[in-house]
Amino acid sequence: MRIGIFGGTFDPVHDGHVNPVARAAERFGLARVIWIPARVSPLKGAPPTDARHRVAMVALAIDGRPDWVLSFDELDREPPSYTVDTLSALSARFLRDELWLLMGTDALAGLRKWKDPEEVVRLARIAAFHREPFVGQGLAIPEVAGLQNRLEVFDGGSFKISATDLRTDLARGGSPAGRVPGPVAEYITKHRLYRGVEG
């Protein structure tokens, strides 16, 4: 069985996350996708929004998709959240399955900065998506041993949404509608998230 792994701060989870993951699941035949909110990203630092809100938003975003599940693996571990540690734990749990690590091409470009990138590539195939129309040129593939044979790049659709820009817009009174799943937009509005907090 192929299992997709998709991690991030999800602050907030938005259509630029959900739609490419749906495309990946269909294209690569992923029987399950595990969504893993990070406690603290080593490259980003602590997210501005409390984990309980980020978890609630991911739960709402994936509701209705029984093949998409929410994991607390990184939230339950002491920070920071290293992908290689998460993949190591998952590979021990799913011994007979093939792990596929899903990420944007922006994250792929920085793969060499990750902890033990060669082990990341050994533990999981990489499926990297563009969030805008892909013309097939200009993609910088990092020099990581084994990556060339373990990498699939695909068009994630025209969903170029930045969580940072979204938070900034919401802080200025903007609406989340049209950029996040409907239930997530309602949650953001109900709990007045991101109001007056830019970045």
Put a short name on every predicted segment.
Residues 1-199:
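Nucleotidyltransferase catalytic core that binds NTPs
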